């Protein structure tokens, strides 16, 4: 829980006091404070914290301590109120459950032994408190409280309360050595007046002796104005200026205590009446702030011893718990270190996995790019293959046409080859016949001058060899017969030659019935008639017409 900020107040020395604090405490179970003091109690007129009850809100907060002066609770002033009014203020604050505790207090530094007890004028116990504690001086700030010291007090009480015994005074002593009271803010040069006269004197006229300040003591004006604030008097700016004008301050800012009391009596008479403090009570109120503590009763000392022992036992238990918690903390620290190392290892592994994932993603992107490139190459290859297939189809069509042409040409050439072979055979036979005829004619012509008997024998031989019947039958007209024979031979040879002489690309063939027909391999056509038969018939007719007149004229000659 954080400290609350001070509420808006009029500018005063209280606001400038470093010991003045305003805190905010969360309201949960209860305030948990035991108080003492008030204007109707001997430890007053201010209200102090006697004890912080364990389990309460202030105990959980931990900022309030026994001995702190309460200034206000939830902006209700605790200055100039009685003990009962202070309790009613706390009760009213408890009923306001919706708001947290807003507590203004002044931290006191000087305690008498036990933290729950501050210097008190009497061992009287208040209604809600334990042994009553004394109030601090109103003439100095809480952080600079002045306590008188005695050198003649014997230490007869328990060592638990050394500071309280150090300031106790006993009625049996007639004289007590006192140290002068000076403001801590003053320099050593300002203590000369205090050395001349003691700061306060004892008044042992009763069981509770009073200690009054020397009027010649010089104190800070701000401290004296703060004492007025403790009394519940809030001087205005004009009153503060008038007070400083009437009280003469030296170069150090200190004023005489007696002069300040007289001026305060004249200026703040009405305000003292409002807070139920008479003018005659101001010195007693101011003087009652430096009362030493009386000795505590034996039962209270025993009670405090028991509380101390219980506190020591609780401290030992807390120490053991602290050691256990320290061991547990060390174990937790070791576990934390192990967890940190594991976390570092996991983080490194995570970074390695992330790097591997990045590399895998990069490789995947590269593979995807290569796959896209392969697909593009495949598409290009498929397009090229389709183009090549189209070209191949065109080329195959052209090849088919060229093959068909070649086949036609081969067929025609084969036909021509066969025809040439047949013509060769026909020419060979015709040539042999012609050669035989010529040889026979030559022998006949050579032997024409031989005797007739020899000639007749040779004719018979030639006729048998050359098959010339006409020449053998008609011996009388030998030249005419020879001419006729030669014509017949020429006709027969021509018939042999012309019969097998077909035009280019023509070939004769036979059907299954043995009928001859002619095939034109160039035009892929067939014909039943010989392609040159008509031309051959015409030529034969012309020759016969020419030979007939000649045969008719030869016998006449």
From Swiss-Prot:
Domain PDZ: 19-105
Disulphide bridges: none
Keyword line: Coiled coil, Cytoplasm, Phosphoprotein, Repeat
Record-listed Phosphoserine modification sites: 10, 12, 99, 216, 467
Domain WW: 500-533
GO biological process, any: insulin receptor signaling pathway
Coiled-coil segments: 298-408
Alphabetized SMART domains for the sequence: PDZ, WW
GO molecular function: syntaxin binding
Superkingdom assignment: Eukaryota
Bias-annotated ranges (Low complexity): 142-154
Xref: PANTHER family: MULTIPLE PDZ DOMAIN PROTEIN, SYNTAXIN-BINDING PROTEIN 4
Function: Plays a role in the translocation of transport vesicles from the cytoplasm to the plasma membrane. Inhibits the translocation of SLC2A4 from intracellular vesicles to the plasma membrane by STX4A binding and preventing the interaction between STX4A and VAMP2. Stimulation with insulin disrupts the interaction with STX4A, leading to increased levels of SLC2A4 at the plasma membrane. May also play a role in the regulation of insulin release by pancreatic beta cells after stimulation by glucose.
Subunit and interaction comment: Interacts with STX4A.
Name of this chain's protein: Syntaxin-binding protein 4
Source organism of the structure: Mus musculus (Mouse)
């Amino acid at each position: 829980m954080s400290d609350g900020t001070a509420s808006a107040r009029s500018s005063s020395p209280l606001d400038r006091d470093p010991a003045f604090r305003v805190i905010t405490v969360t309201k949960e179970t209860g305030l948990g404070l035991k108080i003492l003091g008030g204007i109707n109690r001997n430890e007053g007129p201010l209200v102090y914290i006697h004890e912080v009850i364990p389990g309460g809100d202030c105990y959980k907060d931990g900022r309030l301590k026994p001995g702190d002066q309460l200034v206000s609770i939830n902006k209700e002033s605790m200055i100039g109120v009685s003990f009962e009014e202070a309790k009613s203020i706390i009760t009213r604050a408890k009923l306001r459950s919706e708001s947290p505790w807003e507590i203004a207090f002044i931290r006191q530094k000087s305690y008498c032994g036990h933290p729950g007890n501050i210097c008190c004028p009497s061992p009287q116990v208040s209604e809600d408190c334990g042994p009553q504690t004394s109030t601090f001086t109103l003439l100095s700030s809480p952080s600079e409280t002045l306590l008188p010291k005695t050198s003649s007090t014997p230490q007869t009480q328990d060592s638990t309360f050394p500071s309280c015994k150090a300031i106790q005074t006993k009625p049996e002593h007639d004289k007590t050595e006192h140290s002068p009271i000076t403001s801590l803010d003053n320099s050593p040069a300002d203590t000369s007046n205090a050395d001349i006269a003691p700061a306060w004197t004892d008044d042992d006229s009763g069981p509770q002796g009073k200690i009054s300040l020397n009027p010649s003591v010089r104190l800070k004006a701000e401290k004296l104005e703060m004492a007025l604030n403790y009394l519940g008097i809030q001087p205005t700016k004009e009153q503060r200026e008038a007070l400083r004008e009437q009280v003469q301050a030296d170069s150090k800012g200190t004023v005489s205590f007696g002069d300040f009391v007289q001026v305060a009596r004249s200026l703040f008479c009405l305000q003292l009446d409002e807070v139920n403090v008479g003018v005659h009570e101001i010195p007693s109120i101011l003087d009652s702030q430096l009362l030493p503590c009386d000795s505590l009763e034996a039962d209270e000392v025993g009670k405090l011893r028991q509380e101390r022992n219980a506190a020591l036992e609780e401290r030992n238990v807390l120490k053991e718990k602290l050691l256990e918690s320290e061991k547990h903390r060390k174990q937790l620290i070791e576990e934390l270190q192990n967890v940190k190392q594991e976390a570092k290892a996991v983080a490194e592994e995570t970074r390695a996995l992330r790097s591997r994932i990045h590399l895998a993603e990069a490789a995947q992107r590269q593979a995807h790019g290569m796959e896209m490139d392969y697909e593009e190459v495949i598409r290009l290859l498929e397009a090229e293959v389709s183009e090549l297939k189209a070209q191949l189809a065109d080329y195959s069509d052209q090849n088919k046409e060229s093959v068909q042409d070649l086949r036609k040409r081969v067929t025609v050439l084969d036909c021509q080859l066969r025809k040439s072979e047949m013509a060769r055979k026909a020419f060979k036979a015709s040539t042999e016949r012609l050669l035989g005829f010529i040889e026979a004619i030559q022998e006949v012509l050579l032997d024409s001058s031989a005797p007739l008997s020899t000639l007749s024998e040779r004719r018979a031989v030639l006729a048998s060899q050359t098959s010339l019947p006409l020449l053998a039958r008609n011996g009388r007209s030998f030249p005419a017969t020879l001419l006729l024979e030669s014509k017949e031979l020429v006709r027969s040879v021509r018939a042999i030659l012309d019969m097998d002489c077909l035009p280019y690309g023509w070939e004769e063939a036979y059907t299954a019935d043995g009928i001859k027909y002619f095939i034109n391999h160039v035009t892929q056509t067939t014909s039943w008639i010989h392609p040159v038969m008509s031309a051959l018939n015409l030529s034969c007719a012309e020759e016969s017409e020419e030979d007939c007149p000649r045969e008719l004229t030869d016998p006449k000659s």
